[in-house]
Amino acid sequence: MPLTESAWNESVGWFSSDHKYSTSSNKMRGEEASGTVLHRLIQEQLRYGNPTDAHTLLAIQQQALRRGGGAASSSQSSSESLSQDEPHSPQLSTRQEPQGQEHQVDYQHSENYTTYPHHQEELPTYEQAKAHSQYLASQWCLPHRVCSLQDSVAIQKPCEEQDSWDMKQGHVRSISDRLLHFSMESGKMPCSASYPQINGYHANQHLQYNQQGLEYNKLAPYTEYPFSVEYENGYKAPPPFHSQHNRLPTPEVCHRLSTSPPAGREVNACSRSQLEMLMNENKRLRQELEGQTEKALKIQKLEQEIQRISEAYDTLMKGCAKREALEQALRNKLMAEIKRLQHSSVQAAKQAEAADQNQHAIEKLHLQNEEQKLRCACLEQEVQHLRNEAEKHQRRSEALESTLRSTQTRSQQLWTELQRKRAYVEKVERLQGALTQLQATCEKREGLEMRLRTRLEQELRSLRNQQRQPQPVGGTSHVSVYTLQENLREKEERILSLEADKIRWEQKYLEEKTMREFAMDAAATAAAQRDTTIINHSPCHSFIEELPSTEYRNQEVENRIRSLYAQILEKDTVISILKQKLQHEQKGQLGALQPATADSSIISSHSTPAHTAQGKERSHFNDQAAGTLHSSHAPVEALAHTTDQTPHTEAKPKNIQKAPSAVDLFKGVDDVSAEAVEIFI
C-alpha cells in the first residue's frame, strides 16, 4: 500500500525529535560528568590515600566551593555528599577505575601537609620568600665556599639535577633560612626556641620525603607540583618524581645545619616583638599559600573537566554524524520499500482482476480434480484387492506345491516300500513253492527208499533161502565162483572210482556255486545302491514315469526265464536220451547176472553200505539243491551247472559193466535231478 504525505511527515518529525532529545540528554550527561569529577577524585583519595590528609582535602574542597561561583551547586552537592558519606565511604562505595589523578592529588596534599607548620605562625609571601632566599644564597656562598666545594665534589650530580627545582621551591627552606639570617643581620639577637624546632622539623620532613620518594617512584606516575603557579600562563611542570624525592641534602643545607649558632643564643637574641611579627607574617603566608594551592587545584580540575567535555563533545559529534548517516540510510531504504510496495500493489491488483476472470475455470478444474481423485481412490482399492487376492492365490499355490512335494516324497517312499514288499512276497512265494517241491521230493525219495529197502529185503531173503538150500559140487561151480569173484572185485573197484568222481564233482559244484552266489550278491548290492542313488537324486519326478523302465526290466527277466527254460528243456531231452541208453545197458547186464544167485548175496552185502552212503550223499545233494533255491538271483545257472555235470558223470559208465546196486544209485541221482528241474520250472 502506498504511504501518504502525512505519514511521511510524521516519520520525519519523529526522527528529528529523537535527535534533539538525544543531543540534549548528551549535554546534560556531560555537565553531570564534569560536576562529579571532583567528587570522584576526592573520594578516591579519601579511600586509598593517607588518612591524615582527609581534613586537608575537606578544607580544600570547601574553599574551592566558596570561591568557585560558576559550579557552586554541583560542587556543593558533591561536598555535602562527601561529608555525609565520609565515615562509611570505604564500606559502601564501589571501586572506580583510576583516572590518572589519584597519585597526583595524594602527592600534592602530602606536600602541602608537610610544608605547613603545625603552629599558628604567619609565613612570608611567595615573592618575599623567593627574593630573600636569593639574597641569603649570595651572602652564604662566600664564607662557606670551601665547605660547599668539598661537599659538592661528592654529590655534584644530584645538585646539578636539582638546581632548577631548588630555585623554584626556595620557599620550602625560606622560613628557617630567613629566620636564621634575619637574626644574624639584626645584631645577632636571640630568637625564640621554636625556630630550631622548625629547622629540625624541615630536616626531618626532608628525610621523610627521601624515604617516601622510593615508594612513589615504584608505585605512582610522575605528577605535577601545584605550588609553582603562574596566573598568566598557567603552571609549569615540575621535574621528575625521582629527582624531587630521591636526592641527598645539598652542601649548602648541610653546612647551614652544621654552622648554625646554638639554640640558647638564638632564644636570648630574639625579642618578643620580632617573634610576634614573624608569627603573623607566617600565618599570612600560610593563608596565601592555601589560597594559591586551592586555586591551582581548581584550575587543574577545570582544565581536566574542559578536556573531558571536549572529548565528550567529539564523541557526541561522531555519534550525531553516525545517526544522521543511519537516518539517511533508513530514509533511502524506506523510500525503496515504499516504491516496491506500490509496484507490488499494482501487480496484485492486476493479478486479482485476472484471478476473477479465471475463477470459474478454476472451480471447474477443482471439481474435475476431485472426481479424478475419487476414481483414483476406487481404482487403488480395486488394485489393492486384486493384489491381496493374488497374494492369497500365490500362498495357496505355494502350499499346494509344498503338499505336492511332500506327497511325491511320501509316494516315492511308499513305492520303494511296495517294491521291497513285492520282492519279499515273490521271494516268499518262491520259497514256499520250493518248500512244497522239496517236501514232494522228500516224499518221493522216502517212497523210493522204501521200495529199494523192500526190494533189497526181498533179495536178501532170496539169497538166504538159496544159502540154506544145498548146492551141487562140481567144476562148473568152482569156475562160476571164481568168475563171480572177479566180476565182484571189478564192480567194487568201479563203484569206488565212481564214488571218488562223484565226491570230486560235488566239491567242484559247491565251489562254483559259492563263487556264483558271491558274484550275484555283489551285483545285487551294486544294483541296489545304483537304484537308491538314482532315487535320491531325482526326488521330483513321479513313480508313474518309472513304470515303463520297470516293465522293461520285467520283460527282460521274462525273456531270460524263457531262454533258461528252453535250455532246461534241451538238457531234459539229453537226460532222457542218456536214461534210455542206461536202461538198455542195464537190461543187457541183468541177463548176465541172473544165474549167479550166490554171488548176488555177496554183492547185496557189499552194496548195502554203498547204498547207504549213496543215500547219505543223495540227501546231502538234495539239501544243497534246497540251498540253491533260497538264492533268488541264480537258481537257473546252478541248475544248468548241475545238468551239465550230470552227463559227464553219467557218460563214463557206458563202457563199463555195472552192478544192480550201481544202477539203483544212478537211478536215484537221475530222479533227484529230474525233480530239481521240475521244481525250478
UniProtKB/Swiss-Prot annotation:
Residues 68-84 have a biased composition (Low complexity). Its main location: other. Residues 90-102, 597-611 have a biased composition (Polar residues). Disruption phenotype: Morpholino knockdowns show pericardial edema with accumulation of erythrocytes at 28 hpf with no circulating cells present in the trunk vasculature at 48 hpf. Constrictions and lumen narrowing in the dorsal aorta, these defects are not seen in the posterior cardinal vein at 48 hpf. Morpholino amotl2a and amotl2b double knockdowns show significant defects in endothelial cell anteroposterior elongation at 30 hpf. Disrupted organization of radial actin fibers that connect perpendicularly to endothelial junctions at 48 hpf. Pericardial edema is evident at 48 hpf. Residues 268-319, 362-441, 481-508 form a coiled coil. The keyword Coiled coil applies. Residues 68-106, 589-618 are annotated as: Disordered. The keyword Phosphoprotein applies. Phosphorylation at Tyr-126 is necessary for efficient binding to SRC and synergistically functioning with SRC to activate the downstream MAPK pathway. One of its GO terms (biological process) is regulation of cell migration. The modification Phosphotyrosine is found at Y126. Expressed in endothelial cells. It comes from the Eukaryota. PANTHER family: ANGIOMOTIN, ANGIOMOTIN-LIKE PROTEIN 2. Required for proper architecture of actin filaments and for cell movements during embryogenesis. Plays a role in the radial actin fiber architecture in skin epithelial cells, thereby maintains cell geometry, size and cell interconnectivity within the skin. Plays an important role in coupling actin fibers to cell junctions in endothelial cells and is therefore required for correct endothelial cell morphology and maintenance of dorsal aorta lumen expansion during embryogenesis. Belongs to the angiomotin family. This is Angiomotin-like 2b. The lineage of its organism: Eukaryota, Metazoa, Chordata, Craniata, Vertebrata. The gene is amotl2b.
